[in-house]
Amino acid sequence: MTGKITTLLFDLDGTLINTNELIIKTFQATLQEFLPDRVFTREDILPFIGPSLMETFREINPAHAEEMRVFYREYNLKHHDDLILEYEGVYEAIRVLYEEDYKLGIVSTKMYDTIMRGLKVTGLDKFFQVVIGLDQVSNAKPDPEGIEMALSLLNATKEEAIMIGDNYHDIEAGKNAETLTAGVAWAIKGPEHLAQFQPDFMLEKMSDLLAIVRDEE
């Protein structure tokens, strides 16, 4: 793939905003509520980060998956603003990309309203022209539907786009949509885990994107 990158699509959790503690505590509360006889460590919960909630809960407890999803969302929203954190340098890098007229979008496995809440808490909401949540697509990442929808709304092509994320779902979705891909080294599962899915780039910090998009011009 050659040519100018004009469009950058991002995952939200673990990429733009640090919701790791929020997610882990929410999973712990949900699992304690529905599976009190089982013990889940933080390490046990890490694989749950990335897939959609229903995908995870159907594997754990298919008979109560929907109830678990509802409980999770209620707990998550209640504690959201207290546990969400910013990643150093993300706001500034996104601001520069926005000011340089790059097209910016989000493709997440979270619901649209929860995405917007996280963006507003961190002040990032003003930079993104398109936000695609789980409730706007029929197929979650790694299916390319969300990326393709975002590109269409941004009037952009796959040849000029890059998908950035912290999980294999993000990298695989980008590959399935035939965009460039970038992993983030601050992923909770670690850069080594993400590297095995062979993203085109690995970001040590969000500002690394500036060099990548400028080099592609």
Swiss-Prot record:
Origin: domain of life: Bacteria
Entries under InterPro entries matching the protein: HAD-like_hydrolase_sf, HAD-like_sf, HAD-SF_hydro_IA, HAD_2, HAD_sf, PGP-like_dom2, Pyrophosphatase_Ppax
GO molecular function annotations of the record: inorganic diphosphate phosphatase activity; magnesium ion binding; phosphoglycolate phosphatase activity
Cofactor: Mg(2+)
Enzyme class: hydrolase
GO cellular component: cytosol
Pfam families tied to this protein: HAD_2
Chemical reaction(s) catalysed: diphosphate + H2O = 2 phosphate + H(+)
The EC number(s) this enzyme carries: 3.6.1.1
Active site: D11 (nucleophile)
Key words, A-Z: Hydrolase, Magnesium
Record-level GO BP terms: DNA repair
Family: Belongs to the HAD-like hydrolase superfamily. PpaX family.
Role: Hydrolyzes pyrophosphate formed during P-Ser-HPr dephosphorylation by HPrK/P. Might play a role in controlling the intracellular pyrophosphate pool.
Name listed for the protein in its UniProt record: Pyrophosphatase PpaX
Species: Listeria welshimeri serovar 6b (strain ATCC 35897 / DSM 20650 / CCUG 15529 / CIP 8149 / NCTC 11857 / SLCC 5334 / V8)
Upper lineage: Bacteria, Bacillati, Bacillota, Bacilli, Bacillales
Originating gene: ppaX
